[in-house]
Amino acid sequence: MDKNYYKEYYVLEREHWWFKARAKIISNLIFKSLKNKEKNKLNILNIGAATGKTSDILSEFGTVTSLEYDKDCCDFTNSALNLNSIHGSILALPFREEEFDMVCALDVIEHVEDDMLGVSEMKRVCKSGGLIVVTVPAFMLLWSKHDEVNHHFRRYTMSSLKKIFTKINLTTIRATYFNTILFIPILAFRLLSKLIPTKFIRVGAGSDATLHNNNSISSKILYQIFKSELALLKLFNLPLGVSIFIISSKK
């Protein structure tokens, strides 16, 4: 893929309203779940690191090892950004058993056909008592050309995601939907987007970013709306949303 794409995606991960608000929510949910663990001394594996923003988020909790399946993306980030990403697949993680305190796959397992194997591999390299963090897109009702362009195999419900974790004997600490307030507008947009030619849908854009100027008033409003869910998530789990967050422990 053209290196300019990775440069654009690097900016997108750091400036687009969806990525920015998502980062704050995921960081907060992880922080609240750590409890008595040393919150800045964990050995962390970040699967699907892309251009490194999620690794930046996770670095507040400890030392992060970044893994990325896209070889061209690895080459770009390692040469241009000095991020030291490792090329590898979630289906065959190149690490020994019980190596990490926390293993994360943020919007990753929907990209692999055998998601059960992917989560099993996460469990294998996670220490006993360690944490496994996953986020995924929710509800096939929201399926659109965006999912097709980004090579998704599926979207999840809470029950379908929890079923995977239960089958491989992981204990759920917290599971919640998020990006809830914008669920109806995004549903409407996704339905309308079926009329948009696939070539105009940006690969990797979590919220169909081609239609938003990152500095526009609308983007700033959307960011504040999405970020406002932090207050709700401090009180309770959300009953539906565009995405799902789950954090589990390995016995």
Language-model region placement:
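A short glycine-rich, Lys/Arg-flanked "PGG" loop and its adjoining helix->strand segment in the class I
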Residues: 116-131
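C-terminal helical/coil "lid" or tail adjacent to the Rossmann-like core of SAM-dependent
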Residues: 185-223
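Core SAM-dependent methyltransferase catalytic element
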Residues: 190, 194, 238-251
